[in-house]
Amino acid sequence: MLEGRILAVSSQTKAVSGIPGAPKRVSFAKIREPLEVPGLLDLQTDSFEWLIGAQSWRERAAARGDSAISGGLEDILAELSPIEDFSGSMSLSFSDPRFDEVKASTDECKDKDMTYAAPLFVTAEFINNNTGEIKSQTVFMGDFPMMTDKGTFIINGTERVVVSQLVRSPGVYFDHSVDKGTEKDLHSVKVIPGRGAWLEFDVDKRDTVGVRIDRKRRQPVTVLLKALGWTTEQIAERFGFSEILMATLEKDNTAGTDEALLDIYRKLRPGEPPTKESAQTLLENLFFKDKRYDLARVGRYKINKKLGLNTGQPIVASTLTEEDIVATIEYLVRLHAGDTEMTAPGGVAVPVEVDDIDHFGNRRLRTVGELIQNQIRVGLSRMERVVRERMTTQDVEAITPQTLINIRPVVAAIKEFFGTSQLSQFMDQNNPLSGLTHKRRLSALGPGGLSRERAGLEVRDVHPSHYGRMCPIETPEGPNIGLIGSLSVYARVNPFGFIETPYRKVEGGQVTDQVDYLTADEEDRHVVAQANSAVDANGHFTDDRILVRRKGGEVEFVSSAEIDYMDVSPRQMVSVATAMIPFLEHDDANRALMGANMQRQAVPLVRSEAPLVGTGMELRAAVDAGDVIVTEKTGVVEEVSADYVTVMADDGSRKTYRMRKFARSNQGTCANQRPIVDEGQRVESGQVLADGPCTENGEMALGKNLLVAIMPWEGHNYEDAIILSQRLVEEDVLTSIHIEEHEIDARDTKLGAEEITRDIPNVSDEVLADLDERGIIRIGAEVRDGDVLVGKVTPKGETELTPEERLLRAIFGEKAREVRDTSLKVPHGETGKVIGIRVFSRDDDDDLPPGVNELVRVYVAQKRKIQDGDKLAGRHGNKGVIGKILPQEDMPFLPDGTPIDIILNTHGVPRRMNIGQILETHLGWIGKTGWNVQIAGDGSRPDWAEQLPEEMLSAPSDSNIATPVFDGAKEDELTGLLGSTLPNRDGEVMVASDGKATLFDGRSGEPFPYPVSVGYMYIIKLHHLVDDKIHARSTGPYSMITQQPLGGKAQFGGQRFGEMECWAMQAYGAAYTLQELLTIKSDDVVGRVKVYEAIVKGENIPEPGIPESFKVLLKELQSLCLNVEVLSSDGAAIAMADGDDEDLERAAANLGINLSRNEAATVDDLAN
């Protein structure tokens, strides 16, 4: 059943309801939503529950009337069973998949690098068909990764997300093209299965109907019909109405079924001797055997729907039938003839039209469950081969299911999927919103999907059928634009994998509260009105003509009697991140795209602050993201501390909720939870107990509300640069905590075992001051780059010992052995405080990789204050880099002395057309100061306030406001409220009704000559921090071949002096500078050392030598068999020295320089 039907929720408050204890937000929403936002993680959790056949999924399916469907694992075992041997005398079948308890908790899995998984067992039955003997056993099928409550998987200790894939649905697709030469209309059709060979029919420019089987050469379509057993008379009887098919039949020379079969066999298997039997088997296997060909339920459903077959009957056949092929050919010839309708075999009239491949009726989602199911299918088919072989080799009497089955291929297939598939991704954990959006992502890439290079503009473009299903705004910038999208807020996925969106039913011009979920195909058959169409209290449309949309995105005005459905909510078409942009309706789409994407890059701040101006989506997003702690049962809070909250439930049970304290996220941001309830407080089920990162009182809080002035300032905020007040640095307003993980292991080497120890050779006591007796740094130590975190020594290669050394070794034992210092040190450019240490040892029975005896992890936290070069952004795509941080006293200030926090340039607004930021600034000021609308003596309101609800007529200062997308505050309401703001304590109103204020220059005290827009804007600190980007090098690793420094911060590389920079030097004739840059500062190996020596000894810099890259060029030319000679200015040949220069080695050794630097060298090695 495709149309789900739910009864509407009782009349909702205009703010998002459904979560007890939610913070108060004054909302401008005027449209009542009859439906709550569905669970935002259902896309992931429902699909996985279907795969494992969970009880909750079965109950939901039964409620929907889908009782015929079995779970994903059951399906696949039924598909595989029975496995028979080659003679058919033995068979093995599988059934009843079930799981044991998971082996470890999610926290333990993350800590110990384990996979969060449960053991999977199935019942295997071996039947000996000769004797009738049945042996049944429960067989272990490996550990199966389980989904956490948050919709993620933990694989080897890291959290991963499986992204849903958008693919072309199996089915039958008709296409139209025009022949370039004759300008004739050509039509074709593809029958695309879930798996198996493609079948294509087409009408060519000579008006013959042809068929291509499995992408091979074209043949007349009548050959296929004859091969299926049709006679010429039967073909003429069925297709007599079509001239082109009769013409094709005349041109077809094959005499009967046998000849047609052989003809097809020759085309499919050229070079093999054709026989009737092999040809018959080949054709049957290609399309009519379910082992080789599978339309899947969805493909059968699509074919039946398109061709009008078996309507109203349950979906059974997963292979093609003869009737499918005949109906497809008839549809094609009628389409070519220009017919608009055809009568299907069942007597049903179906429209004849070409298909739009980018329509969401023809694209479906492969969700997590299906992706994992496909992977298990691969593993099981590999296992099937093994079982068959073992059936033939093992003794029949001794065979048990256990001896036949090898689970390795299945386990390997699952591991391969989670570890390496393009759709199993390292979870984006910058903040709760980024994680939530990642789980709701839809990707057209991946195995069986499109590739970046081949995807054209049509696939990437916004399509009318995306409305309410995929967000038209949120997609990446760059090569993946349009290929990766995000599920809309209200959308859900039906059992066939098509995305549905809810609509309110309209009956006889009256809007009811009945909600139906429609797929894109079904929506095309109806007339749909917008959510903001005016409706009276009884649900009747108040206007005579209402704007509606029809199939293909056409909009027009119609009378209310013609309307079938109405949108559920104004925010129905956008995704969660987009729905969190206030005044989205005033932003240009390109900037809204950046705004939605940049919210995902927000860094959690030390103190989160919910936005003054929100959209009402903040609460649901934060709760569903799963980073806040929610009460399971109603009760009373018994105990609260920084680490846990205990709740005594009304049924007498106690539950203790543990907080995550300063944990490291995947992206190195800090995930910290803190309680927001008090002892003795009563809490409802579903109420937020503790805030996580980027949340305040259970609401998403990605940034800070800052007092902003929009004005140019001395040119310092030119080109989107931003000017900040020093107050934000001093008071840690935009300070964030970042946690880095450093890891070192002690292994067994050929020369002996490495050892983690405090006893490091040639190191002063100062360096070891913070190490404990094991050689591991203490928690709380302040560290900077180069400091030792964990001491480790590695045995050096030993030469033959002298008698004296042997004596010393005998007396003092191992200590006299030569060891190298290979300690873990803080990388270049990093500082911080040690906040955690984890030690894993083989002696403590910890599970470690082979050859590793001990593993130490050190967590270093950095407190990063805001600084010049960091990137800030608003929610409207208005991003910029901090150009200057001014002392608080130099910032412009309001007439009451309040200094501005942040100055943005006016030039960043007009051409970008993101006016939402200006409206947000004004509304932010209104919310901060509070307001009181003046009511006349007779109780009448001003005109602009007519539509405002009663509770909106006055509000105190610091009131949080919700202005939902497409249903928010109007301009006249903003103007009116700006004129009704509350005065400050001196009785003065700082900002006039036009939103502008007189500002004074902090340096001179003089007023600026023009009024300036002032208000509160929500500013986000982005993940692009200058500390992660700035980089400098003196000496470091060199490339092994060219001997030039490596590039990039990660490799501790140098700055490339490139072609254009050389031109600049040449243009100025700076010959010696240029020579120095190209030799001794780059890859003149000998010169580098000699210069270093000269500097140390205070001598003059010697002449540069030959660069290494020049020698490489000579070698490359010689490898092409060219005899290359280097001549001096007087024509004499110069010998290129290739050998080792002993003087050079000696000089380098004296100076303590290691010349064997290459790519493999790490920064730590170089510091030694």
Swiss-Prot record:
Superkingdom of origin: Bacteria
GO cellular component, one term: DNA-directed RNA polymerase complex
EC number: 2.7.7.6
Nucleotidyltransferase keyword on record: yes
CDD domains: RNA_pol_B_RPB2 (cd00653)
Top-level EC class as recorded in UniProt: transferase
Pfam families: RNA_pol_Rpb2_1, RNA_pol_Rpb2_2, RNA_pol_Rpb2_3, RNA_pol_Rpb2_45, RNA_pol_Rpb2_6, RNA_pol_Rpb2_7
Keyword line: DNA-directed RNA polymerase, Nucleotidyltransferase, Transcription, Transferase
One MF annotation (Gene Ontology) recorded for this entry: ribonucleoside binding
Role: DNA-dependent RNA polymerase catalyzes the transcription of DNA into RNA using the four ribonucleoside triphosphates as substrates.
Family under the similarity heading: Belongs to the RNA polymerase beta chain family.
NCBIfam families the record matches: PRK00405.1 (NF001616), rpoB (TIGR02013)
Assembly mode: The RNAP catalytic core consists of 2 alpha, 1 beta, 1 beta' and 1 omega subunit. When a sigma factor is associated with the core the holoenzyme is formed, which can initiate transcription.
Protein name: DNA-directed RNA polymerase subunit beta
Source organism: Rhodococcus opacus (strain B4)
